[in-house]
A protein has these predicted regions:
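Conserved alpha-helical "signature site"
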Residues: 1-155
Length: 155
């Protein structure tokens, strides 16, 4: 019952990403906080991406999720991303923080780490975002991550 509920909430592609994340955590004996950080980044990127092109929207969740891969494997992110079958745009967004998806990810990471002073106002305006957008996206990410955590506890 909770699995079908999860599929309704997340969609099948998100379930695959989430299952991979959970598996990584169990295999590598990583703290729950890493899973939370990964999901928070993914959902915050997803929420903010609605102001962007369809291409950015499609990559944003994955970019947020993949941006913590180095912590999961204790290996440099750039090396890990080279071996994954990903588009150059997604790879560059995660590793180099280039393109709109990369810039979005950069802002999300800084916001989540309370590095607000390192988010240039002109970068936000170029992306068409405001601090209120970031705050709303953060609240959204918390709510979605909490939903996932509750589903995991039910299992």
């Amino acid at each position: 019952d909770s699995i079908s509920h999860a599929v309704m909430i997340l969609g099948i592609n998100r379930i695959r990403s989430w299952a991979t994340l959970v598996s990584l955590g169990k295999l590598n004996h990583k703290p729950d906080e890493l899973q939370t950080e990964s999901l928070m980044r993914a959902y915050m990127c997803e929420n903010l991406s609605t102001k962007f092109s369809a291409e950015v929207q499609q990559m944003s969740f994955s970019a947020g999720l993949l941006s913590c891969l180095d912590a999961w494997f204790d290996y440099p992110l750039e090396q890990l991303m080279k071996v994954l079958p990903l588009s150059h745009e997604l790879r560059d967004a995660v590793v180099l923080k280039t393109g709109e998806t990369g810039q979005l990810l950069s802002v999300v990471v800084k916001y989540m780490h309370s590095q607000w002073d390192q988010i240039p106002a002109n970068q936000l305006s170029e992306l068409g975002l405001t601090l209120a957008d970031l705050s709303d996206a953060y609240a959204y990410a918390i709510a979605r991550t909490d939903q996932i955590s509750e589903l995991m506890i039910e299992e």
